[in-house]
Amino acid sequence: MARDKQRTKKKERKNIAAGVAHVNSSFNNTKILISDVQGNAIAWSSAGTMGFKGSRKSTPYAAQMAAEDAGKKAQEHGVKTLEVQVQGPGSGRESALRALAAVGFNITAIRDVTPIAHNGCRPPKRRRV
């Protein structure tokens, strides 16, 4: 007997005017999460989900594509203004920020929330190339 197909519920369109864009840019990848003011996720994307693999994930272009993708998804939910929180030392920070502005968001604040260790963990050893 054939099993009944399980129906997937279509994502409901939330109507949120303001949101927070969390841009996490590491040395290897750039992730963008757009949430509401309380922190509930609305849309997200990363350089890896955009189809970039390996060292291409860490490029500014990959970060730009990921930011555009997350921005378009968030606009479907009615987000118009964004507060941007940037974290990490990666090369995709500025390009992701510019891409979010180019999508058409009104950016109200840009905040750097990179954690700074006060002599915490020992850093990784230097690369010998």
Curated annotation (Swiss-Prot):
The keyword rRNA-binding applies. GO terms for cellular component: ribonucleoprotein complex; ribosome. InterPro entries: Ribosomal_uS11, Ribosomal_uS11_bac-type, Ribosomal_uS11_CS, Ribosomal_uS11_sf. Signal peptide: none annotated. The keyword rRNA-binding applies. Disulfide bonds: none annotated. One of its GO terms (biological process) is translation. GO terms for molecular function: rRNA binding; structural constituent of ribosome. Pfam families: Ribosomal_S11. Keywords: Ribonucleoprotein, Ribosomal protein, RNA-binding, rRNA-binding. Belongs to the universal ribosomal protein uS11 family. Located on the platform of the 30S subunit, it bridges several disparate RNA helices of the 16S rRNA. Forms part of the Shine-Dalgarno cleft in the 70S ribosome. Part of the 30S ribosomal subunit. Interacts with proteins S7 and S18. Binds to IF-3. This is Small ribosomal subunit protein uS11. It comes from Dinoroseobacter shibae (strain DSM 16493 / NCIMB 14021 / DFL 12).
